[in-house]
Structure formats: C-alpha cells, structure tokens
C-alpha cells in the first residue's frame, strides 16, 4: 500500500468538509503504458469522491488474462503513484473486482470507464460490484489507447504530429491492429446495434479513434495555481514523450531541490523534437504530451511549445530561480549554440541524475522486440470482446419469459 498524502483524509468514515463522511473511491487496472486517457479516468473518479485508491494488477495476472505487459509491475506502481489525483496505490490488486476488495479498503464504490474488461474466460470483471450497485462509470477518453501508441511506434510515420494528417498507411495499420485473423464467434449474426458499435467486425473498445483537442481538457488537467511568495520556481524543458517513469524519477528529484518547489515544464513543438530526436519522434504530439505532464503531481505548470533555447525573456517572465536538465545529451540549437547558455551565465543551471536509465527509445525497443506478442494480445482481447457483445445480443433477442 502506497500513500501519497496529497488528498483528503483516508480513514473510513473520516469527516470531510462540512462534517460529511469521506467518500472513498476504488479504481483498478493494468495501467500499462500510462497515458493521459488513464489520467483522465482517474481524474473523473477522484471527482466522484474525496479519496481515491487505485489497485494495480501484477505482471502474472495481466499475462494470464490479457498477455504480456510492456512495463513491469514496479514500474506501473510508480507511474500510477505519480498521477496527482491518486491518494493511494494498492499493489497486486486482484484482476476481478469483488465486494471483498471494496470492503477491505473501505471503499464506497468503484469507478471504471465505459468500456468492457473481461477475464480470460470472457466474464465481466466488474459483474459482482455492478449487481451490488457499487459501480460507477466515467467517460472513456477518445483518441488515445495503448493500441494506438504501439502502432505509432511500429510505423515510421509522422502522421500523428500535430500539423499533419493521418497517412493511409497508418490508418490501415490502425484499422487492422489486433483484428482477429479468423471470423469472430459472432460471425455475421451481430445485430445492427452491435454492428454499429464495431464496424468491420472490430470491437468498439480495442482500436483507434480520433482525439479532438480542446481547451477545456487542458483546464481540467491544470492546477490553475500561480507561484506563491516563498516558492522556488524551477524550470525544466524537453519532449517528455511517452511520459514514463524515467521522466517521473527526474521530476521527483527536481521537486526535492526546494522546500516549496513550483516546477514549470517547457514542452517543445513536435517539429523541434523531431529535429533533435529524428525518426518519427515524438510518438505523442504536443497536445497529448501536455496533458500527460500536467497529470504529474510534481509539475505545477506547463509551457506549451516552449523555445528550444532557454531565453532571458522566458527566465524573466516566469521569475525562474533554477533551471534543471537530466543526464541525457544536450543537443545544440539550430545555430549550434548551447540551449542552456543563458541560465548557465546566470549561475542557475544544474544537471540532475535521477538514477533511472529508462528512456523513450528503450520503451520503443521493448515494443518492437515483442511486436508479435502485443499483436497477439490485442487479437485475443478483441475476440473476447466481440464474443461478449454477441452474448449480450442473444440475451436481448431472447423472448421475454423464456427460460433455459
């Protein structure tokens, strides 16, 4: 059990504002390749109560029901713990959510997105808590999924960058990734209602959809707090692509540099990241990276589209006290100059060694190495979802009053 200590009182029955009993909320999941969709689900869940507890499944449980995870359980525990709406993390949470689990952690109800999670034998993992009326649903974030991110890594295309349209090659891959190579158990008997949810025999929950950028989403993720007197303003800059525990470890170390830190993260434009990273980087576009970083508890503010070189204007505008960089190589600006020349001149620059060796490149290498396993995992997952939808259709089609 890992407590963050940033939320409301965690004890069962503890009185919250106005003398009301604290409402404790439970979420659980794999939280593999954590992205802003996961963060948004946890944000919505936290808004339904006062204290959010998140259970994270083990590698063994995930492999049994879905297939191999990209990240280890220890990495996944740390990532969830870093999300600012999470008050407590429960490692090794059971894959099937039961009333026993909710009662053990004194939770009033659990929250899950409006998609389906199935066991290895095709059963709804939330069936028991749904029947007991201790289940709440929140909206799934459209336009981001592990499937989509894996597809971007495997195809060397820049179609996902903010200024470009999706290529036909990427769309073809996105449409076929995880699609069963054989007819699904549903065959051609899917009802029109179900068929509308899964065109082309695809599950409505496993696949790729378009993410629509809105200012409201940024507002929901942002803290909205200005630096206060006595706080130390620390500036960091980079791509923060596929926001991962390497970034979290770095930001956590930066956060420790001051008694009252106010950390500002400057995110570079997609084209700038591609200049110094090459290939098809960044994997996530600027808007997606912004939401991912805003969800981190160690970050107070984000500069969207920050200049590559840290300028005097930027330092003066934000009244920056300290500028930090990790142990990754510092690539010169387009004109060959040092991007940290100004903070170095002022004597406010320092490099941080977080102790983590994980990089975005290493994550992509993991995916490419295990490509066939991940594709097989999605094929298996989608086949189960389609079978579940067909079972629902048959149940709805059964004449009322008919018994087995």
Curated annotation (Swiss-Prot):
Matching InterPro entries: CCT, Cyt_trans-like, Ect1/PCYT2, Rossmann-like_a/b/a_fold
Any one of the GO CC terms: cytoplasm
Coiled coil feature spans: none
One of the protein's GO biological processes: phosphatidylethanolamine biosynthetic process
UniProt feature, compositional bias: Polar residues: 189-201
Chain positions with Phosphothreonine modification: 359-360
UniProt pathway: Phospholipid metabolism; phosphatidylethanolamine biosynthesis; phosphatidylethanolamine from ethanolamine: step 2/3
Keywords annotated in UniProt: Lipid biosynthesis, Lipid metabolism, Nucleotidyltransferase, Phospholipid biosynthesis, Phospholipid metabolism, Phosphoprotein, Transferase
Record: residues binding CTP: 239-240, 247-250, 277, 325-328, 354-358
GO molecular function: ethanolamine-phosphate cytidylyltransferase activity
Enzymatic reactions: phosphoethanolamine + CTP + H(+) = CDP-ethanolamine + diphosphate
Modified sites of kind Phosphoserine: 356
Superkingdom as given in the UniProt entry: Eukaryota
Top EC group: transferase
Gene3D superfamilies: HUPs (3.40.50.620)
CDD domains per UniProt: CCT, ECT
EC annotation from Swiss-Prot or TrEMBL: 2.7.7.14
Region ranges (Disordered): 173-201
Function field: Ethanolamine-phosphate cytidylyltransferase that catalyzes the second step in the synthesis of phosphatidylethanolamine (PE) from ethanolamine via the CDP-ethanolamine pathway. Phosphatidylethanolamine is a dominant inner-leaflet phospholipid in cell membranes, where it plays a role in membrane function by structurally stabilizing membrane-anchored proteins, and participates in important cellular processes such as cell division, cell fusion, blood coagulation, and apoptosis.
Family from the record: Belongs to the cytidylyltransferase family.
Protein name: Ethanolamine-phosphate cytidylyltransferase
Organism: Rattus norvegicus (Rat)
């Amino acid at each position: 059990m890992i407590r963050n200590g940033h939320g409301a009182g965690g004890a069962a029955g503890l009185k919250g504002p106005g003398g009301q009993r604290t409402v404790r909320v439970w979420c659980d999941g794999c939280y593999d390749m954590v992205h802003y969709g996961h963060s948004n689900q946890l944000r919505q869940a936290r808004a339904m109560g006062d204290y959010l507890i998140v259970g994270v499944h083990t590698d063994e449980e995930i492999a049994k029901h879905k297939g191999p995870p990209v990240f280890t359980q220890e990495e996944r525990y740390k990532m969830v713990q870093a999300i600012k709406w999470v008050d407590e993390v429960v490692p090794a949470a059971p894959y099937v959510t039961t009333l026993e689990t909710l009662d053990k952690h004194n939770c009033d109800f659990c929250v899950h997105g409006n998609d389906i999670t199935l066991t290895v034998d095709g059963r709804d993992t939330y069936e028991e808590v749904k029947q007991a009326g201790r289940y709440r649903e929140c909206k799934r974030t459209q336009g981001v999924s592990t499937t989509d991110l894996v597809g971007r890594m495997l195809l060397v295309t820049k179609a996902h960058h903010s200024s470009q349209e999706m290529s036909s090659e990427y769309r073809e891959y996105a449409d076929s990734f995880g699609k069963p190579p054989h007819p699904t158990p549903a065959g051609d008997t899917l009802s029109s209602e179900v068929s509308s949810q899964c065109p082309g025999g695809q599950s409505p929950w496993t696949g790729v959809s378009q993410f629509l950028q809105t200012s409201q989403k940024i507002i929901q993720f942002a803290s909205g707090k200005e630096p206060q007197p006595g706080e130390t303003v620390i500036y960091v800059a980079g791509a923060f692509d596929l926001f991962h525990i390497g970034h979290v470890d770095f930001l956590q170390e930066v956060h420790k540099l001051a008694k009252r830190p106010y950390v500002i993260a400057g995110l570079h434009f997609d084209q700038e990241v591609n200049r110094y990273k090459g290939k098809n980087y960044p994997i996530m576009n600027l808007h997606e990276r912004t939401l991912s970083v805003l969800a981190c508890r160690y970050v107070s503010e984000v500069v969207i589209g920050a200049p590559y070189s840290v300028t005097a204007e930027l330092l003066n505008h934000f009244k920056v006290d300290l500028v930090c960089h990790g142990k990754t190589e510092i690539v010169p600006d387009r004109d060959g100059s040092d991007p940290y020349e100004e903070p170095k001149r002022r004597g406010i620059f320092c490099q941080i060694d977080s102790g983590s060796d994980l990089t975005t490149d290493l994550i992509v290498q993991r995916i490419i190495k295990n490509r066939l396993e991940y594709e097989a995992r999605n094929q298996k997952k989608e086949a189960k979802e389609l079978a579940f939808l067909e079972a629902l259709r048959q149940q709805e089609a059964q004449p009322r009053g008919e018994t087995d």
